[in-house]
Amino acid sequence: KIEMVNAPLQALNEVCLLWQIDVDELWTRDQLIRMREMFLAEPERTAAFYWCHFFVGEDLAISTRHCYAQRPEKEWLRTWRYRPGMIWFSHAPPWLSLPGPKGWSIVSEAHAFSHAETEAAGLVFQHYAYATEEQVAFKERYYGYHGAVAEWERLNQARHAPLRLGDYLHWVQDETRVDRLDRLGIVPLARRDPATGEWRFAH
């Protein structure tokens, strides 16, 4: 994966913002514009960390922090001020590195926007990581989460919330809680059409 993520950098010959946006991560246009404005206003900033709304079902998301999928020491670093010559030293964690007189340094270790700063600006993205059965089936195969689909179905059939995620998904070993989107005040950016089963952007 290192070769894959480094390949596009060869085409970047000027200072710019570099974003990692996975296929299951949704942002709004206004969020991207706002983050750009913040980087322009503070030229010394090097990167940005974010919180996310982490979906574990069509209508369920994680409600706690400093837990599974919400560990601020490594999640979620998604934006960097890229300068020509930088390279990826690691894909996971995403370490973009800069050459210097004393060797290579990790860009995000100095002057990054914190989770609190980006959240205060409304920059919390929506991560549809386990929103559909198809996603869970893939992760069951890819990560070896035996029985993941059955566990996920039981989680999403539960009638009461909040719930302890580890009581349903066996690979979650901490006290992570999940709750309904409406109880969390989350307005989803994508919804499944109950008639067709197709997912559509809501905005």
Predicted regions and their residues:
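Short beta-strand-to-loop acidic/aromatic patch adjacent to the donor-nucleotide binding site
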Residues: 15-26
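Active-site nucleotide-sugar/metal-binding loop of Leloir-type enzymes
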Residues: 2-17
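Catalytic-site signature of metal-activated, phosphate-bearing donor transferases
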Residues: 1-6, 28-203
